[in-house]
From Swiss-Prot:
GO terms for biological process: translation. SUPFAM superfamilies: Ribosomal protein L36. It comes from the Bacteria. GO terms for molecular function: structural constituent of ribosome. This is Large ribosomal subunit protein bL36. It comes from Citrifermentans bemidjiense (strain ATCC BAA-1014 / DSM 16622 / JCM 12645 / Bem). Keywords: Ribonucleoprotein, Ribosomal protein. The keyword Signal does not apply. Pfam families: Ribosomal_L36 (PF00444). One of its GO terms (cellular component) is ribosome. Transmembrane segments: none annotated.
C-alpha cells in the first residue's frame, strides 16, 4: 500500500474505488495498491 497525493492506475487491472471519502486503487499486484492521503 502506497500513500500518495495523486493516485493513478498503473496497469489494466487497477481499479479506482472511493471508500468513506478515501480514494483507493485496488489491484491484483500488491505493489499497485494506493491510497490518497
Amino acid at each position: 500500500m502506497k500513500v500518495r497525493a495523486s493516485v493513478k492506475k498503473i496497469c489494466v487491472k487497477c481499479k479506482i474505488v472511493k471508500r468513506k471519502g478515501i480514494v483507493r486503487v485496488i489491484c491484483e499486484t500488491p505493489k499497485h495498491s494506493q491510497r490518497q492521503g
